[in-house]
């Protein structure tokens, strides 16, 4: 944005809200959300970022990933993919990766994630123009992420796979009414996310069914619900 940005606060919190327009594209507004590692409701930054994406429904997301710490950063990427919003991944600090004789297979990442992945160095302003072009393109043509099933459906993830799809079937009408992405809502409901459960407005019978489905998965996987979902994501990242 250069110097063309405004700083305010998100309603009800002291988290900065930075907005501006992209150079050469004055009609395009860009909002810089707080740096976070997940969409869990455990900090004001996470809640603000999640609410913005869910409520404002941006035309596209630029997900900036630290290429030197890719595993930790891709956890958030997977949650953003579940929101089914056009997205481009900016693989930042690629100059440091290459400087340390490292490498990242960008084409493989694009294939696995189902979205464009652009290597950049923000510090050196390398790849930024290409990133902006991709972001504007997917926003204009509403190119949503290719649908990915993060479960590998092996014996290890089979229980999680069945659980997620059973919960999707249970909540999909409620998710549509609440204007929530159903895959995201399903995984958060499994984790017991109180804010998402409140928005879904499930009746007691549906809550009981949800609990039964999740408990069955916990029994099969022999881990609790949050760990099962986290394991699914980390297993996918390790591919």
What do these predicted regions represent?
Residues 95-152:
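Canonical P-loop GTPase G-domain recognition
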Residues 20-25, 48-118:
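Conserved C-terminal guanine-recognition region of P-loop GTPase G domains, centered on the G4
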Residues 3, 12, 35-36, 67-71, ...:
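Conserved nucleotide-binding/hydrolysis micro-motifs of P-loop NTPases
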Residues 1-44, 54-56, 60, 82:
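Conserved G1/Walker A P-loop phosphate-binding module
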Residues 11, 15-18, 29, 41, ...:
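Helical mechanochemical/support elements of P-loop NTPase systems and associated helical scaffolds
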Residues 7, 37, 41, 68, ...:
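Catalytic cores of large soluble enzymes that bind and process phosphate-bearing ligands
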Residues 114, 141-239:
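Extended helical scaffolds that flank P-loop GTPase cores
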């Amino acid at each position: 944005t250069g110097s063309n940005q405004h700083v305010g606060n998100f309603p009800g919190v002291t988290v900065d809200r930075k907005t501006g327009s992209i150079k050469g594209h004055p009609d395009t507004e860009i909002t810089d959300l707080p740096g976070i590692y997940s969409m869990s409701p455990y900090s004001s930054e996470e809640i603000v970022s999640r609410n913005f994406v869910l409520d404002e429904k941006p035309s596209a997301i630029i997900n900036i990933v630290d290429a030197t710490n890719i595993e930790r950063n891709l956890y958030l990427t997977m949650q953003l993919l579940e929101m089914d919003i056009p997205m481009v991944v900016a693989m930042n600090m690629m100059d440091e990766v290459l400087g340390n004789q490292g490498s990242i297979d960008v084409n493989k990442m694009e294939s696995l994630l189902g979205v464009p992945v652009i290597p950049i160095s923000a510090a050196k302003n390398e790849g930024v123009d290409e990133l902006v072009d991709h972001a504007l393109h997917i926003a204009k043509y509403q190119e949503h992420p290719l649908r990915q099933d993060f479960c590998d459906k092996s014996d290890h993830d089979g229980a999680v796979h069945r659980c997620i799809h059973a919960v999707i079937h249970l909540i999909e009408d409620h998710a549509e009414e609440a204007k929530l992405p159903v895959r995201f809502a399903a995984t958060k409901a499994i984790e017991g996310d109180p804010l998402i459960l409140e928005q879904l407005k499930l009746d007691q019978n549906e809550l009981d069914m949800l609990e039964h489905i999740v408990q069955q998965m916990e029994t099969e996987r022999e881990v609790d619900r949050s760990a099962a979902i986290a394991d699914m994501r980390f297993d996918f990242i390790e591919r």
